[in-house]
Structure formats: C-alpha cells, structure tokens
Amino acid sequence: MSIVAELKPTSTFSFKPNKHSVSDFALPTTRVESWKYTRVGAIDSNWEQAERNESIVALEKGIRIENGFIALPTGQISGVSFTAGKNLSAEQQGLVLSMLAKENRNDVFDAISEKASNDLVLIEIQSGKIIEETISIEIENTLSDCMSTPYMFIVSKENSIAKFTIDFKGKTERSFHLVQLHALVEQSAQLEIHQLQNTSKNECVLLRESISQSEKSVFKITTVTASGAWVRNELNIRIE
C-alpha cells in the first residue's frame, strides 16, 4: 500500500510496497489529450520502485529525495516544520487529504502516485514567520530504471514569507521522476519557488504542481529546464 493510500481509511488498494513498475499501470499508447505534450515513446516498462535506503545522506537545511524516498533535514530552520508521512498527526492527515481533494485529475499519473507513492513530506511555514534562508529540496535518482513517485506538501501560513529551490539532478541511464507538489498559501503569505531540472538525457521528469492561494497572498514560480529525455511541467493555480 502506498503512503497516500494509508491515509485513506476507505482505500481498498492492495499493492505491496516497492514492487510496482510502470507495466502495472495502463499508460496511454497514443497521443490522447492528457498526453499530447509527452513523447510516449520515452516510456520504459522496466521502470520500477527502488527499495528504501535508510542511509540517505540528508541535507542540513533542506529535503533530500533519493530514488523517491525522503530524508528530512539534520538541522533546524526557525519557523519551519518538516513532517514525514508516517508521522503525520490526525490534524495534519486531514490537511493533506484536503489539499489532495482540491486537485483530482483522475488520470493515469494520479493513479501511479496514489497507488505507488514512495514517500511524503509536509512542510509548514508558521504564521507570521519570515524565513531569511532559502529552503532547498534536492531530487535525484541514483539507480537506473528507477520510478520515483514522492509527494510534497507545503503550507505557507498567514503573513509568512518563504523561498524554496527545487533542484532535479542525476545522471542515471534510465529513470522516471513523477513528483506531486501541493501548496497552500494562506492570507497575506508569500511563497516563492525556483526550480532547476538538470537530469541526464535519458531521464524523464513529470512535475505536477497544484497551488491554492488566498486573494491577498503572493505566489511566484520559476522553472529552468536544462536537459532530460522528456520533461513535462503541469501547474494549476486556484484563488480561494
């Protein structure tokens, strides 16, 4: 069962962890509407989830995601909390599920993420906190034929200010990143994200971002793509 499926008491998923491959899912073989910006020929049925590595070298001031699994920072950032999926409180679980419910595409990519997600992290910026230092998120596949499917949730609470960098890196022969990022930007909060996608020419990246922001909040995002077999970025922003 995936990390997200475990949050849903009505789930009937029976998938075993770390045993999924792309061939388990009904990926499209023609250029249907939901796939029109992607070269379907780049899909590799050999992609599969890696085993969890308990010795990931964590960052001091940010998140390290290696082969889909998340290592929390070793240091503290004042005003910021990082919570792994397995440690979410009942209140945090409710928050995560409410954010997921806002963006329900019901397509094959959501099926992969929901049923075969590797890991999950919730990052919360406390109310009124101005975070001077940039929070780093480093994403890398170190294994060939690796299917990396993490979830990231960012909550910028009222009157807070925070900036993130998301750095995709890696030089594997073949691998697949399917990253789901959900952010909630509350009243008068500011959230800024800078992304660099610099994987090898044989790696595939699909980044799905769902942003919910209050009317008086500020959200900025910059994405630079340097390389990759195919890269697809989906960004949905809603004003609440």
Where are these regions (language model features)?
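N-terminal leader/transition segments
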Residues: 1-149, 156-158
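Conserved beta-strand/loop scaffold segments within soluble protein domains that form the structured core
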Residues: 91-240
